[in-house]
Amino acid sequence: RSKATTFGTGELIKDALEKGCREFIIGIGGSATNDAGTGMLSALGYIFLDENGNELEPNGENLINIKSFKDDKVMKEVSEAKFLIACDVDNPFYGTNGAAHVYGKQKGATSDIIKILDDGMRNFSNVIEKIKKTDISNISGSGAAGGLGGAFTAFFNSELKPGIDIITEKIELENKINGSDYVITGEGRIDFQSAMGKTPSGVAKLAKKYGIPVIAIGGSVDDEIGNIYDCGITAAFSIIDSPMTLGEAMDTKNAQRLVEKTAEQIFRLIKQNKKN
């Protein structure tokens, strides 16, 4: 929400730096924050100021008031570190597809708060461009985790890379996919965001190179998913088989049963098609 902060993330990085860590892989996403990373930056020594030079509390609400920042108290270790940022979405910093508009509602923000946050993100982006000569406004993934992706890009020696790319390289997924008959992927909720750099689309793009059908399984499947087919997903199925609460659906034993049941039905159909 408007007062939520990434300060705790900064504290974790600070602790790791103090213990000698200089190479980081940080996964961003699924956050409850929309402060453009100012909380994290504050924990590492950055100070944000309003037009009168007064220090501001780092949160989403104050983004609109930031006119400058000071970095003379930033930990020297920050400049020695390299950050590989695992980012599964490609949203820009602000705007219609930016952090506030796409993820604000999910985090409990009303339409009025979303406007405040988006205007603040735009202002902070302009301040960054003016002082650091870096335009993060349309960098793919800069809007991830409420703008945390943009903060890493502008203030640190960092690289934003899809989390799926990091994982696929580590486990050599493309080699495993090549030669398969079918590929199964999925996530909790399959919706239009699934095609925006998230794991299902990353897997599907690899499979598409070899003409392999991709089946996505999710806890729920939204109505507006036409874009997922463009990235290579053949079909998507929800595992829910009867009315149930979210808690029941997420229960570990229940979820496992539902996934197995759905997978069995999918492959029964595939098996029958092969017979025909």
Question: Model-predicted segments: where are they?
Answer:
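N-terminal loops that bind phosphate or other acidic moieties
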Residues: 1-28, 32-276
